[in-house]
Design a protein with these regions (language model features):
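Alpha-helical transmembrane segments of integral membrane proteins
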Residues: 23-26, 171
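Intrinsically disordered, low-complexity regulatory regions of eukaryotic regulatory proteins
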Residues: 2-3, 30, 324
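Non-globular, low-confidence helical/coil segments that flank catalytic cores
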Residues: 44-367
Length: 367
């Protein structure tokens, strides 16, 4: 308001206008501070991935598997459901990861195979969370009472929820990601689109591995691509089924993030396989007294190009030489359980890993 306009106002109105103009800068500062406070309050207590990023949670289910992927558009895939019982502990931890990611339902749940530490949590999960579809490799193939029981419990739990049987070469529709099934029911993909098979020099010294008759070698495994970022999760695939993926030619190529096969058991993680995929970072979803075998740990630790090997638990049945440094372990011996790793990936291939126990994040720049 100009001075000549002020003189046209009645005296009382003119005094109010002058006071308002004198205090206007302070009012503007107050509004700015309020806006900043509201913005901070809205995000306090949440660590959702920034827009345009892929989030991957390696949830602590005590040596089982539950891995949550959330796309930039909040589409979701849960790989496996952890154990049954324990007062719904594993379903609680899955729900906590979902809350952190800002989602309330699961679009897809992939069951890699029908062992209790992977499929056992399904009944608890469906009681709490809406699931769009379940995916698995088909009928249980293992001749054991416990696995037959767990498979039957899974089929009963999913009820009328859509179920899709996946085969090598199938894709899982997650907008923004390319999610391809590499292995399922003992079969493997013949070629990965966009990957040129290369001869694998590590095959020459790899022993022959016998095939076991459990559900493990029938694991449904996936390769997830988000721009240049590549994540590999093959469930509990064992050595005899790892080798055809990389020998004589490497069909997979290199990966940025490797969820260590079979929780780090030495029945899996053959040297020719691990060295061929050349992981930049590996996460071992072992338990305190489950897996984390010294031989498997050493193979992954020594793989060419590896920068860090994270562990969900200290492997208490191993020795200090075959455990990662404490900052790379989510749950330490003698400490509280339930801590997890959260990976946030960008389409340019860069990513970070956050240890929820420490709150510390390590960045892995584009290379």
């Amino acid at each position: 308001m100009r001075n000549d306009e002020l003189h046209c106002l009645p005296p009382a109105r003119r005094r109010f206008s002058l006071r308002f103009l004198r205090h206007l800068p302070k009012l503007l500062l107050a509004f700015d501070a309020l806006a900043l406070f509201l913005a901070c309050t809205a995000t306090a207590g949440h660590t959702q991935a920034p827009a345009g990023h892929l989030a991957i949670y390696t949830i602590d289910v005590e040596g089982g598997q539950a891995t949550l992927l959330v796309s930039p558009t909040k589409a979701s895939l849960l790989v496996d459901t952890g154990w049954p019982g324990n007062n719904g502990r594993d379903a609680d931890r899955i729900e906590a990861a979902m809350k952190d990611a800002g989602i309330t339902k699961l679009d897809h749940v992939l069951i890699t195979h029908f062992h209790v530490d992977h499929v056992g949590g399904a009944p608890n999960l469906v009681e709490r969370v809406k699931v769009g579809e379940f995916l698995d490799h088909g009928e249980n193939r293992e001749d054991s009472d416990i696995t037959r029981h767990d498979y039957a419990a899974y089929i009963k739990a999913i009820g009328n929820t859509p179920r899709r049987i996946v085969h090598p070469g199938d894709t899982i529709d997650i907008p923004g990601l390319t999610t391809m099934v590499l292995t399922a029911d003992g079969e493997h993909i013949a070629a990965v689109p966009g990957v040129k098979p290369e001869p694998n020099p590590y095959c020459a010294t790899e022993p022959h591995w016998d095939l076991d008759t459990t559900e493990n070698p029938r694991s449904a495994g996936i390769l997830v691509r988000f721009g240049k970022f590549r994540f590999l999760d093959l469930g509990d695939l064992t050595k005899a089924k790892e080798i055809p993926l990389v020998c004589p030619d490497n069909l997979i190529g290199h990966v940025d993030l490797y969820l260590v096969n079979h929780h780090g058991f030495n029945l899996s993680n053959s040297k020719a396989f691990v060295d061929a995929i050349h992981p930049r970072v590996a996460i071992m979803d072992n338990g305190a007294h489950k897996a984390g075998s010294p031989e498997a740990w050493q193979t992954v630790h020594e793989s060419p190009g590896l920068e860090d090997l994270y562990m969900v638990h200290t492997a208490e049945d191993s020795d200090a030489a075959h455990n990662s440094p404490d900052p790379l372990i989510a749950n330490l011996k003698g400490g509280a359980d339930g801590a997890y790793f959260k990976v946030v990936a960008s389409a340019d291939g860069s990513f970070s890993v956050m240890n929820s126990r420490t709150g510390q994040t390590k960045e892995y720049a584009v290379r």
